[in-house]
Amino acid sequence: MSNRTSNTTVEPRGSEVENRENVLLLRRQSVPEHESNPQERTKATQKKKKKKPKVRWTEDVVDNEDMNKKKTKICCIFHPQRNFDDGTDSDHSHSDSDSSSDSSGDERGGHEGSSRGPDGGNDSKKIVDGVKKEPIPNAYEYQPVYKNESKLPPGINDER
């Protein structure tokens, strides 16, 4: 540590500080001439800013949960809550004899397509009313259908 002590003095406005060596300037005293013209200043800042490419989204692009974050692929799956005030769903029976139910497996505590066979492995098909049904893929397994709107110039790939 040094044995130097510092003294802070407040000078009245307008008085000159004779010893400029220990003075910290917080504002510039004078503005350079090339920065004094506002038009030149805006041109200089415009040159510094790089032009970013603008992305144009088509109508079929996913708006990520109405947050105005456009994405070309699904990163989260949002399922809005259903109204349970409807009397149609509340009369639903969870018994095995109710075959007219089209409810998902997670309402019964299970999952679609996760039934286990006698050997303990996953069955590829689920038996309902004696008929084997294909399991419905969940939203992460389902591959959306994309429209290929790109067009090749005439003369390329005409063998089709």
Swiss-Prot record:
Residues 44-55 have a biased composition (Basic residues). It comes from the Eukaryota. Residues 30-43, 82-97, 105-114, 122-135 have a biased composition (Basic and acidic residues). Its main location: nucleus. The keyword Nucleus applies. GO terms for cellular component: nucleus. GO terms for molecular function: protein phosphatase 1 binding; protein serine/threonine phosphatase inhibitor activity. It is found in: Nucleus. InterPro entries: PPI_Ypi1 (IPR011107). Keywords: Nucleus. Residues 1-160 are annotated as: Disordered. Residues 1-10 have a biased composition (Polar residues). Pfam families: PPI_Ypi1. Regulator of type 1 phosphatases which maintains protein phosphatase activity under strict control. Belongs to the YPI1 family. PANTHER family: E3 UBIQUITIN-PROTEIN LIGASE PPP1R11, E3 UBIQUITIN-PROTEIN LIGASE PPP1R11-RELATED. This is Type 1 phosphatases regulator YPI1. It comes from Scheffersomyces stipitis (strain ATCC 58785 / CBS 6054 / NBRC 10063 / NRRL Y-11545).
